[in-house]
Amino acid sequence: MIPMQHGLILAAILFTLGLTGLLIRRNLIFMLISLEVMINSAALAWVVAGSHWGHPDGQIFYLLAITLAAAEASIGLALLLQLYRRHHTLNIDILSEMRG
């Protein structure tokens, strides 16, 4: 069995990588992938904690995280398609420009 500290350290590293990718990248596809990594790292922390204490709650929260990630991906991809159709780019900075 993997010690709890190792699983939580791995989850923290993955969350940090996802947060870094979310803050640094300006492409919407990379931002969605980074957000998925962050959601999965939080779910990993729940599973590790649940397996350490012998409760199935971590696995239940993992199922919740999977459904949340699926909803986030579908909404994000719909926004991505609309952004590309209107502006012919996937750069998120285009959305912050004001029309005048």
UniProtKB/Swiss-Prot annotation:
Protein name according to UniProt: NADH-quinone oxidoreductase subunit K
EC number of the protein: 7.1.1.-
Subunit structure, as described in the record: NDH-1 is composed of 13 different subunits. Subunits NuoA, H, J, K, L, M, N constitute the membrane sector of the complex.
Recorded GO MF terms: NADH:ubiquinone reductase (non-electrogenic) activity; quinone binding
Catalytic reactions of this protein: a quinone + NADH + 5 H(+)(in) = a quinol + NAD(+) + 4 H(+)(out)
Similarity comment: family membership: Belongs to the complex I subunit 4L family.
Keyword Transmembrane helix: yes
Entry's localization field: Cell membrane
UniProt GO cellular component terms: NADH dehydrogenase complex; plasma membrane
Function noted in UniProt: NDH-1 shuttles electrons from NADH, via FMN and iron-sulfur (Fe-S) centers, to quinones in the respiratory chain. The immediate electron acceptor for the enzyme in this species is believed to be ubiquinone. Couples the redox reaction to proton translocation (for every two electrons transferred, four hydrogen ions are translocated across the cytoplasmic membrane), and thus conserves the redox energy in a proton gradient.
Source organism of this protein record: Hamiltonella defensa subsp. Acyrthosiphon pisum (strain 5AT)
Listed InterPro entries: NADH_UbQ_OxRdtase_chain4L/K, NUOK/Mnh_C1-like
Pfam families named among the record's database cross-references: Oxidored_q2
Cystine crosslinks: none
Keywords, ordered alphabetically: Cell membrane, Membrane, NAD, Quinone, Translocase, Transmembrane, Transmembrane helix, Transport, Ubiquinone
